Amino acid sequence: MPSSWGKIFKVGTFGESHGKSVGVIVEGVPAGIPIRLEEIQKDLDRRRPGQSNLTTPRDENDTVRVVSGVFEGKTIGSPIALVVENQNTNSKDYENLRTTYRPSHADYTYQMKYGFRAHVGGGRSSVRETIGRVAAAAIARMILKDDLGIETVAWVDSIGTIQSTIGEKYPKSREEVDQNEVRCPDAVSADQMRSLILKMKEAGDSVGGTIKCVSYNLPPGLGDPVYDKLDGDLAKAILSIPACKGFEVGSGFSGTLLTGSSHNDEFYVEGGTGKVRTKTNNSGGLQGGISNGEELVIRAAFKPTSTIFKKQNTINLKGEETTLEAKGRHDPCVLPRAVPIIEAVVNLVLVDAYLYQRAINPQWFQKWARIPDYYKDLEL
């Protein structure tokens, strides 16, 4: 079962929903980087369950522990192991899933592929796998911010038929997004979304939606042509998130409604800075699979949570038709907790692209990167 990703900044996650622990091994992190444990914990706190009555009531502290790769608060170049203990499992609620498949869940496909599965909590298909990715991405975020000034901010753009009305007035910080529990910067829409989620929760049902994400201060040159396009890497990473079913960059599918003359992003030279800019950003910051220096703009679609508390038709292990009323603790809508997960996988893709570009083109690094003091402190 593949569980690793990355060319330079390599991430390998481990653990299941109801196992003893979940975590991640991170390779390729340069030595000498200060690891701010409180920043990693802050990111994990944003994705943890039990944050509000909009999320699953499973109450986990998700306290991270650094097992290796860090000495006196700094990376030493060896693999970094980050571990979070599972403390609030309730496996008896899943006993009926030992022999019965949840519709639209990974239960059936895992059974068909492997012939055996961990039925409690969804096992490896659980969103708790993303704890490792969020923890690793906190390190990635530190590197991107310190070296390039890159900031990635995601938010809930829609839930059900309720659409945020902020347009291209994108939030500049995660603090703006976190002002409400829905994580939608449009306060009016957020209230409507909250009511819809609670309505679905009361009905034992679920609802999906979309998340938008912007990365600021990307330099031109990240990503590679053809098979290693940055948008291709982003698509694979984002679609690997549980419940994510759609992805677009820039104008995305709506761009098909435009003509070339209205869709093309015309270049100009910015007065005062001399920077090459584009008048519009329908490309979403990517052209030919490579960043062009504009904001990276993506959107991801999440289906309604598959585990619901309504009676549904399904089959059992014997292939017999039956019905299922699910138990356990589940999110009526994954969107509020998926926001930090989207930010995480975007940062993982970007840091891998950055470290690769830095390795193959030192002149690019000298031109675009800021050299933090901790690199200068290395005794070589």
UniProtKB/Swiss-Prot annotation:
<dbReference type="GO" id="GO:0009073">
    <property type="term" value="P:aromatic amino acid family biosynthetic process"/>
</dbReference>
<dbReference type="GO" id="GO:0010181">
    <property type="term" value="F:FMN binding"/>
</dbReference>
<dbReference type="InterPro" id="IPR035904">
    <property type="entry name" value="Chorismate_synth_AroC_sf"/>
</dbReference>
<feature type="binding site">
    <location>
        <position position="47"/>
    </location>
    <ligand>
        <name>NADP(+)</name>
    </ligand>
</feature>
<comment type="pathway">
    <text>Metabolic intermediate biosynthesis; chorismate biosynthesis; chorismate from D-erythrose 4-phosphate and phosphoenolpyruvate: step 7/7.</text>
</comment>
<keyword id="KW-0274">FAD</keyword>
<dbReference type="GO" id="GO:0005829">
    <property type="term" value="C:cytosol"/>
</dbReference>
<feature type="binding site">
    <location>
        <position position="288"/>
    </location>
    <ligand>
        <name>FMN</name>
    </ligand>
</feature>
<keyword id="KW-0057">Aromatic amino acid biosynthesis</keyword>
<feature type="binding site">
    <location>
        <position position="329"/>
    </location>
    <ligand>
        <name>FMN</name>
    </ligand>
</feature>
<keyword id="KW-0285">Flavoprotein</keyword>
<comment type="function">
    <text>This reaction introduces a second double bond into the aromatic ring system.</text>
</comment>
<dbReference type="InterPro" id="IPR000453">
    <property type="entry name" value="Chorismate_synth"/>
</dbReference>
<keyword id="KW-0028">Amino-acid biosynthesis</keyword>
<protein>
    <recommendedName>
        <fullName>Chorismate synthase</fullName>
        <ecNumber>4.2.3.5</ecNumber>
    </recommendedName>
</protein>
<comment type="subunit">
    <text>Homotetramer.</text>
</comment>
<feature type="binding site">
    <location>
        <begin position="303"/>
        <end position="307"/>
    </location>
    <ligand>
        <name>FMN</name>
    </ligand>
</feature>
<keyword id="KW-0456">Lyase</keyword>
<feature type="binding site">
    <location>
        <begin position="124"/>
        <end position="126"/>
    </location>
    <ligand>
        <name>FMN</name>
    </ligand>
</feature>
<dbReference type="GO" id="GO:0008652">
    <property type="term" value="P:amino acid biosynthetic process"/>
</dbReference>
<dbReference type="GO" id="GO:0004107">
    <property type="term" value="F:chorismate synthase activity"/>
</dbReference>
<dbReference type="InterPro" id="IPR020541">
    <property type="entry name" value="Chorismate_synthase_CS"/>
</dbReference>
<keyword id="KW-0521">NADP</keyword>
<keyword id="KW-0288">FMN</keyword>
<dbReference type="Pfam" id="PF01264">
    <property type="entry name" value="Chorismate_synt"/>
</dbReference>
<dbReference type="GO" id="GO:0009423">
    <property type="term" value="P:chorismate biosynthetic process"/>
</dbReference>
<comment type="similarity">
    <text>Belongs to the chorismate synthase family.</text>
</comment>
